Amino acid sequence: MEIERKFTIKELPADLDSHTCLLIEQAYLNTDPVIRIRRQDDDYYLTYKGKGLMAREEYNLPLTREAYEHLLPKADGNIITKKRYLFPISVPSFREGYQPESLPSLTIELDVFEAPFAPLIIAEVEFPDKEMADAFLPPDWFLADVTLDKRYHNSNLSRMQDPASLQNSSSLQDPSFLQG
């Protein structure tokens, strides 16, 4: 089970380049149900995702490079390329009254999308359970919680007719660029 929340951000952190960075390329063989192929640095995966916005089933199967390259031309829609920066959260904040049984190890996955999706930037945080996800208080540099907005799901981005229109957005946080 994957349980995650998604956020837009106010600005890129100043220490961005001091964090681990993964290079990701992904494409969708199907979007209902979601069947995705991904290259993450030198690793390759086939992923099935069930229905849901914050919580859903997810299964990852390793692929060889040859299998990935064979499947890539069969993908529908746009290929998504992004840099993922990993920010460990040493002491996460939670709403008043929520106390986790143990201090969780959480990580912000900051996805900086490349063309044709630039300037889109999305922060994701995965949780061990839904209760913790609901109680999580995001850091100050996060802006809007877009977890329940389907437009921010990569499978929907892959189907955008005109991803170049994202470049005309006046704001990284403005969700209007995802319309159309």
Regions found by a protein language model. Name each.
Residues M1-G180:
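Phosphate-end processing signature that detects enzymes handling 5′-triphosphorylated RNA
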